[in-house]
Amino acid sequence: AVGQVEPVFCNIRDDASVAAVTRGSDAVVNCVGTFDRKGKNNFDAVQADGAERVARIAAALGVKNLVHISALGVDRDELSEYARTKRAGEAGVLAQFPSAMILRPSVIFGQEDGFFNRFASMARIGPIFPLMGGNTRFQPVYVMDVARAAVMGVVGTASGIYELGGPETKTLRGWIDVILAEVHRTKPVFNAPMFVGRMMAWGLDMMQTLTFGIAKNGLITRDQVKQLKTDNVVQEGAKTFEDLGIVATAPEAVIESYLWRYRPSGQYDAIRD
């Protein structure tokens, strides 16, 4: 609610800055992550060193409970820098704050998500839908469900590592079909080979490098292509929503409320005829 959350600036790369926003807190939730492989806020600085710093300072200042948001599959993805630094971050957190709660969500969906919104936006462009990693499985999880899990760590009723996935698992191609149906668009989906994805990502990464970051690669990076080789689903035997008493929300129950804007006639698509 308005007035109950006060945003403050913090540099996760600086001890004094982290200490300033942590001091006096009973609980800390670290949601900071990045897809940038270069610059000051790169993978190592944010997801490895930054995560360890937050945990170390929280412990030193007597914070009671710490929740660290990681990502699903990082313990199985041996290829990407994103996963490597997420793993290092988890290790640093547990070394400094052993009672921390670590949440590993699959791709998170909600009003401003970067999964369903991104692909729905792509569906508006061109006569075909190009896709890489179409056979990789995903288990999208609702942002409010992840928040409910985090609250349990904040109040100290749960700790340890939890893998969070929604109630439905589909291949990426399967989720594209769901999105196309939701935005009322029909077009063939072209499953591009991974080497095509690597070439395209290399070109986009080079564009960003040669323009000194002015032209951002917001489509797909080489590291994200590597991530598409690993399924993004909950492992058997992992602690999950069920252990927290939370019933996960299906994407179809939520995405219609915000994907309508990608339909040919937006919210009036049903009556355009």
Predicted regions span which residues?
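NAD(P)H-binding glycine-rich loop region in Rossmannoid oxidoreductase-like domains
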Residues: A1-L61, A71-E78
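Short alpha-helix in the Rossmann-fold core of NAD(P)-dependent oxidoreductases
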Residues: D44-A51, V67, K86, Q139
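A conserved pocket-lining segment of Rossmann-fold NAD(P)-dependent short-chain dehydrogenase/reductase
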Residues: S121-V141, D145, A149-E168
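A hydrophobic C-terminal alpha-helical subdomain
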Residues: F195-D273
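Conserved beta-loop-beta element that borders a ligand/cofactor-binding pocket
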Residues: S70, E90-N117, S121-R124
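Substrate-binding strand-loop-helix patch
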Residues: R137-M144, L164-E182, N191-W202, V247-A250
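A short helix->loop->beta-strand "cap" motif at the edges of active sites that frequently abuts
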Residues: A60-N65, F97-P98
